């Protein structure tokens, strides 16, 4: 299986912040990677485009992927509302690791987070399935608009997204 690369055009209050590209580990975590890829392209009729990063904690992570409700309470995968943890072999080794947000075991949907640091306490609990390939500095810039309480000072949006 080919490891796809997707992109996010990120804006801050409607102003361009930059484009990040993300390599998906489809060779090891195909179901999770396919969910994220399809939500990036919109080929199933729903997508990440226009959704925001609703939770940003500096030094920890930037969380987004709720395209059904903009507040972090919505979740929808290409397989239905939720799908099982595929495997937990990849580790949260540092900044740029892409992982599924969840509410416990086997509750993956559309929400994801990008690590801003090594977060080993998430190993075995969240499916890490990709890594920011280019422009991790955009993720670092996004951190400046978050607070320790996870609120954001600016609206950080996925203005466009797709697959290379």
Swiss-Prot record:
Catalysed reactions listed for this entry: [protein]-peptidylproline (omega=180) = [protein]-peptidylproline (omega=0)
Q: What is its EC number?
A: 5.2.1.8
Q: Provide the protein name.
A: Peptidyl-prolyl cis-trans isomerase A-like 4E
**Where does the record say this protein resides?**
Cytoplasm
Broad enzyme group: isomerase
Q: Which GO terms describe its biological process?
A: protein folding
GO molecular function list: cyclosporin A binding; peptidyl-prolyl cis-trans isomerase activity
Additional observations:
It is one of six related genes or pseudogenes found in a cluster, thought to result from gene duplication, on chromosome 1.
The family database entries (Pfam families) matched by this protein are listed as: Pro_isomerase (PF00160)
Entry keywords, A to Z: Cytoplasm, Isomerase, Rotamase
């Amino acid at each position: 299986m080919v490891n796809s690369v997707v992109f996010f055009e990120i804006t801050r209050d409607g102003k361009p912040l930059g484009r990040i590209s993300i390599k998906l580990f489809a060779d090891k975590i195909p179901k999770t990677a396919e969910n994220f890829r399809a939500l990036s392209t919109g080929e199933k009729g729903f997508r990440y485009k226009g959704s925001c990063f609703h939770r940003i904690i500096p030094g920890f992570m930037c969380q987004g992927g709720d395209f059904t409700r903009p507040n972090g309470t919505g979740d929808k995968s290409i397989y239905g509302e939720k799908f099982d943890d595929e495997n937990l072999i990849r580790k949260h080794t540092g900044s740029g690791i892409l992982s599924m947000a969840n509410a416990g075991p086997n509750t993956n949907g559309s929400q994801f987070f990008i690590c801003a640091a090594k977060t080993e306490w998430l190993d075995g609990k969240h499916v890490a399935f990709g890594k920011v390939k280019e422009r991790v500095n955009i993720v670092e810039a996004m951190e400046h608009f978050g607070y320790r309480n996870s609120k954001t000072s600016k609206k950080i949006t996925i203005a466009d997204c797709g697959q290379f």
